[in-house]
Amino acid sequence: MLQPARTKYRKMMKGRMRGKAYRGSDLNQGEYGLQATECGWLTARQIEAARVAITRYVKRGGKLWIRVFPDKPITKKPAETRMGTGKGNVEYYVAVVKPGRVLYELAGVDDESAKKAFHLAAHKLPVATKLVKRGSTL
């Protein structure tokens, strides 16, 4: 599972997701990319599930880059606990995603394989996505 090795502070405020992503919205390494079209939180498990779906489909055919990292800790209180007595313990980590953010990049495969692989991965993610190609959208 992806998570930070160490953090300056253990717990973080909830925050807001406004606007669109300007950084991380272009393809860096790959020929194809999976781009978010809405905002949301991607958990480390969801990122990993989508990665497995892509790599299983393309097998050894292509190279995959993960462009998001879950660095925001999400806390949770135990069940049947009274309110108060501070913030809960860290349960898992999420990556904050805004519209336009490229989540995954893929190279070394043809159009059809990239389309199918990203379609399988999109089903594992809680945000709406679209497929982008270097130079144009598919």
From Swiss-Prot:
PROSITE patterns: RIBOSOMAL_L16_1 (PS00586). GO terms for cellular component: cytosolic large ribosomal subunit. Keywords: Ribonucleoprotein, Ribosomal protein, RNA-binding, rRNA-binding, tRNA-binding. One of its GO terms (molecular function) is rRNA binding. It holds the Pfam family Ribosomal_L16. GO terms for biological process: translation. The keyword RNA-binding applies. The keyword Mitochondrion does not apply. HAMAP family: Ribosomal_uL16. PANTHER family: 50S/60S RIBOSOMAL PROTEIN L16 (PTHR12220), LARGE RIBOSOMAL SUBUNIT PROTEIN UL16M (PTHR12220:SF13). Part of the 50S ribosomal subunit. Belongs to the universal ribosomal protein uL16 family. Binds 23S rRNA and is also seen to make contacts with the A and possibly P site tRNAs. This is Large ribosomal subunit protein uL16.
